[in-house]
Amino acid sequence: MDVTAIFAGDILVQSREYLIPNDVVDVDGGIKAVRPPIIQPPPGRKLPLIDFPGSSWDFLTYFAPSKTVKRQSSSSSDNTSDKEEVETEETRGMFVQLGDTAHEACPFATNEADSSSTVSIISPSYASRGSIVPSWLKRKFLGRVSLGFVYEGSSGSSVGSESTCSLMTPSLEFPDRISFRKKDFSEKGPSRHVWEKRKLTRAKLIENFCNPEDIEPVTSWLKGQLLGEESFASVYEAISDSSVGSESTCSLMTPSMEFPDRISFRKRDFSEEGPSGRVKEKRKLMRNKLIENFRKPEDITSWLKGQLLGRGSYASVYEAISEDGDFFAVKEVSLLDKGIQAQECIQQLEGEIALLSQLQHQNIVRYRGTAKDVSKLYIFLELVTQGSVQKLYERYQLSYTVVSLYTRQILAGLNYLHDKGFVHRDIKCANMLVDANGTVKLADFGLAEASKFNDIMSCKGTLFWMAPEVINRKDSDGNGSPADIWSLGCTVLEMCTGQIPYSDLKPIQAAFKIGRGTLPDVPDTLSLDARHFILTCLKVNPEERPTAAELLHHPFVINL
């Protein structure tokens, strides 16, 4: 008989002995077969179902009984028992329980010279080790279980050519010989019905987990960053072509009547000794007026500040949670004197709060109120969880379907804004956020960078999306809405290519190119609809650019 060791961490199981003391057949010093057991082991611990290639794991239950078992022999002919003690052995081993064999008849074939040692067991559920194999060699790694590792091994006392220690036993049929050799579970093998049963179980599992009727199945998607790992699975972020929502919002929008008449490169002296010596006192009055004009559509009285989401020159944006467990975004602005930039900061805050409090639309970031302390102003806004479109195209290569869906949502928000007489003035991927449902929301977490148009050199990345009339210090449209359309064309180009417009130029070089009416490079590899949409937006003459309402009927955003 084979004496094959199975190692799983500190667990060693042998196929040599079965410690059930009722009617034991002793062949060559080893117990080969038994009748139905009398001793029932205590409840044990079940391990998860694990499958290795070409083999089958069953549920394993292990016990560590400390009692001493006396072996007794009996005669199957007269059903009388020999009371003489044959051997005493301490059961320190591990039982292996076969989960699905409780009602299977499992014959044990033993030595041909001893025909009486062949018996049939109605419930052969338990096995235990005898003595530890003193000499064995560890070979290749087979797998990992909760209790340790399983290796292929060979014993110095093993019989036969196979010495694989796999500890994998079929659940529906017990082998004719007690052996831990690998079994053939292919369709042509002796355990074909096991294979077929697994296929049926797998098919039933898939059938039971199909999508509900009210949920559109995901047919095309891209895998993103790893979110977490579990025992049997890993969880990733993913983006779908068909799961993008229909809502979009817009944040940091400046009233059109405040569009600057011209852009100057001169720095202004806001010190007390300068030509604007009374500006400090004026700043205090503006700050007090801003605080007095707070609107609180929602009463957020107690909240905790969380992780940083973004930072600009004037403001930082944090995640926050209220005492009711509601999450939102907090834009934190210092009210301390910031020198020559303080007046502009306060003007921006006043304009943004006034604008957000007026807008109520599904495509506009929801304004949730304001608060203040001694030195800081807090603006509460809707929290958008998935980050900016810029971060998304850096993680994924956005398909034309996704770009088209995002563009349609941006247009819906711009159309509402322009009808209200406002312009956004900073349309770009970094200012568009996406929630978990694929809804695009325009925002600006870098408050200062979003509307600092008095100094082109300080506009940093914003300059690359500016329209020619903005660079050339004129607003020929009256309310500036064509400037948003130009920026939208640059934004769609950015989403399609994964690069900002004029990416090969420095800011000052790009300013001269844009001012002269030189278009950014639009690759010929883009789809015809995408290319036509971008070039339609990038008309040098603002009067030739379509409105947001007209672009909502463009084939690029309706032929999905």
Curated annotation (Swiss-Prot):
Residues 303-557 form the Protein kinase domain. InterPro entries: Kinase-like_dom_sf (IPR011009), MAP_kinase_kinase_kinase (IPR050538), Prot_kinase_dom (IPR000719), Protein_kinase_ATP_BS (IPR017441), Ser/Thr_kinase_AS (IPR008271). Residues 70-91 are annotated as: Disordered. The active site is at D426. PROSITE patterns: PROTEIN_KINASE_ATP, PROTEIN_KINASE_DOM, PROTEIN_KINASE_ST. Belongs to the protein kinase superfamily. STE Ser/Thr protein kinase family. MAP kinase kinase kinase subfamily. This is Mitogen-activated protein kinase kinase kinase 3. It comes from Arabidopsis thaliana (Mouse-ear cress). The lineage of its organism: Eukaryota, Viridiplantae, Streptophyta, Embryophyta, Tracheophyta.
